[in-house]
Regions:
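C-terminal catalytic "cap/lid" subdomain
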Residues: 2-314
């Protein structure tokens, strides 16, 4: 029986310390090699989503540096579209090379530019939370605020300050129905890059909005809409922990929705890092009754052999 898995890649799978295109392409080639075992036995249909927080923030800065009457800077929704195409191209290249290297040329690869519908009244528009772009020290942050006083910055996990923008919850993926025949044809599909281009519904179609959607919540929505059997959220650690970095820390393996909701109520997961991944996984499990796993790229082999990682069950 063929199993359909939606894989959500963390930012560490694309951008390391070097923001050049070449470095990000090399990082994705490594990522593609690590993901291929999922599909090598022809028993898994894989759909891949990814974030774009660093890339879209960097692109906006480039846009603003060149902003002029004759060459105006693009708005945030358009920048999301640009990075979705950019990273989608890199991912298609990386998967194609990895497939050829592993004698799996039979698997076609496609990257689809997708729009994600959000609610125009989502309270997230009034409370920016999504970090984008580079890190700044305090002096750098103050300098940016002098140039752009309406920007909002937050301290990010002890690594410095980052700009944050609205991150409304996704309600649906416009192109979801068009994706199903591609996936069923054993095409390796990359979709909903950077959470998808944020749009709201209008009488004559859709209108782009200034936001960046969390890629894990978007992945949960994609997984639901394409009827995936599993949602696999990849991050920097093999398991989710409670009492993290404390003497009594404990890794979570198989946990229920009710247990995870209890840990959230205790404040076990950091708002800017593990919490949205856990919440996205819970969203998928509660809507579908199917499992979601949070683990690392490096743990994929063990996930395949032993179902390891933190697996959330109904």
């Amino acid at each position: 029986m063929v199993r359909r898995i939606v894989v959500a890649l963390g930012g560490n799978a694309i951008l390391t310390d070097d923001p050049t295109a070449q470095a990000q392409e090399i990082a994705l080639e490594t990522t593609a090699e690590q993901l291929l075992p999922l599909i090598k036995d022809n028993d898994v249909e894989m759909v891949v989503t990814h974030g774009n927080g660093p890339q879209v923030g960097n692109l906006l800065l480039q846009q603003l540096e060149a902003n002029s009457e004759k060459n105006p800077a693009m708005p945030l929704d358009t920048a999301v579209a640009m990075t979705q195409g950019q990273i989608g191209f890199w991912m298609s290249q990386a998967f194609t090379r990895a497939l050829i290297k592993n004698q799996m040329e039979r698997v076609p690869v496609i990257s689809v530019v997708t729009r994600t519908v959000v609610d125009a009244k989502d309270p997230a528009f009034d409370k920016p939370t999504k970090p984008i772009g580079p890190f700044y020290d305090e002096a750098g942050k103050d300098d940016m605020l002098k140039q752009y006083p309406d920007w909002v910055f937050v301290e990010d996990s002890g690594r410095g300050y980052r700009r944050v923008v609205p991150s409304p919850k996704p309600t649906r993926i416009v192109e979801a129905e068009a994706l199903k025949p591609l996936i069923s044809s054993s095409v390796l599909v990359t979709v909903s890059g950077g959470g998808g281009i944020p749009v709201v519904e209008a009488e004559d179609g859709y209108v782009g909005v200034e936001a960046v959607i969390d890629k894990d919540f978007s992945a949960a929505r994609v997984a639901d809409l394409v009827e995936a059997d599993d949602l696999l959220i990849l991050t920097a650690v093999d398991n989710v922990f409670i009492n993290f970095n404390k003497p009594d820390q404990k890794k979570l393996e198989e946990v229920t929705v009710a247990e995870m909701e209890g840990y959230i109520a205790e404040g076990q997961f950091a708002a800017g890092s593990m919490l949205p991944k856990v919440e996205a996984a819970l969203d998928f499990v509660k809507k579908t009754g199917r499992p979601a796993t949070i683990t690392s790229l490096e743990n994929l082999e063990d996930f395949l052999k032993h179902d390891s990682g933190t697996k959330i069950l109904p």
